[in-house]
Amino acid sequence: MKSIFVAGTDTDVGKTYITAGLAVALRKMNVDVGVMKPFAAGTAQKKGFKSEDVEILAKAAQVADPENLINPQFFPIPASPYTAWKNLKTKPKVSTILSSFKKLSKLHEMILVEGMGGIMTPILKDYYITNLIKEMKIPSVIVTRSKVGTVNHTIMTIQMCQKYKIPIKGIIINDFDDDGYPIKNLKRDLESLTGVKVLGSIPFIKDMSNASLNRIFKKNIDLKSLLK
């Protein structure tokens, strides 16, 4: 079973919550799912995982894998790997990321890899998230918003994936609300303009318990298409 890279059209589109929800729902389908966030950044937590996002993923997937495999590199400032490298003099370790991914892949049937920022977030000079996905040799799922402007961002993200020959499993629309693009119209337009299937849309989630995530994702996401 192929692992999947959960990519976003931008930062803060909800990649962590989508990855967590997918992990919970797939586990309920008896898929042995592992999780990974190659790069994380921000203020380190005092207890548990350094990254809150990584902790959310590990709890959702109910894994006890070492932190250095789930999150091989953490930067203590909110910045891209490239900017963190320039500011902190800590170079992103792509070889370590790829090695950790291979090790995790031997421990689980499938790995959900959460990206960082958008698809062209820089890791090194002339090396972006797209390059990393390409080296991992896995397909992607694109997480996008429902707000006005999302069509532009989603099309650009998909075109970059296509340029790098990254297979796309589908699009997930996250956190839809009444003030955004009407979901039915957005789904129609995205599929018509990109030729990529919209796997579903997720409303704002207040209850992040595994039971709640499973219920919401089972109801709203085409999980069978995701696993094809």
Curated annotation (Swiss-Prot):
Its EC number is 6.3.3.3. Mg(2+) binds at residues 16, 53, 114. Keywords: ATP-binding, Biotin biosynthesis, Cytoplasm, Ligase, Magnesium, Metal-binding, Nucleotide-binding. It catalyses: (7R,8S)-7,8-diammoniononanoate + CO2 + ATP = (4R,5S)-dethiobiotin + ADP + phosphate + 3 H(+). Its main location: cytoplasm. GO terms for biological process: biotin biosynthetic process. SUPFAM superfamilies: P-loop containing nucleoside triphosphate hydrolases. Pathway: Cofactor biosynthesis; biotin biosynthesis; biotin from 7,8-diaminononanoate: step 1/2. Belongs to the dethiobiotin synthetase family. This is ATP-dependent dethiobiotin synthetase BioD. HAMAP family: BioD. CDD domains: DTBS. The active site is at 37. ATP binds at residues 12-17, 53, 114-117, 174-175, 203-205, 210. GO terms for molecular function: ATP binding; dethiobiotin synthase activity; magnesium ion binding. It is found in: Cytoplasm. The gene is bioD. The keyword Glycoprotein does not apply.
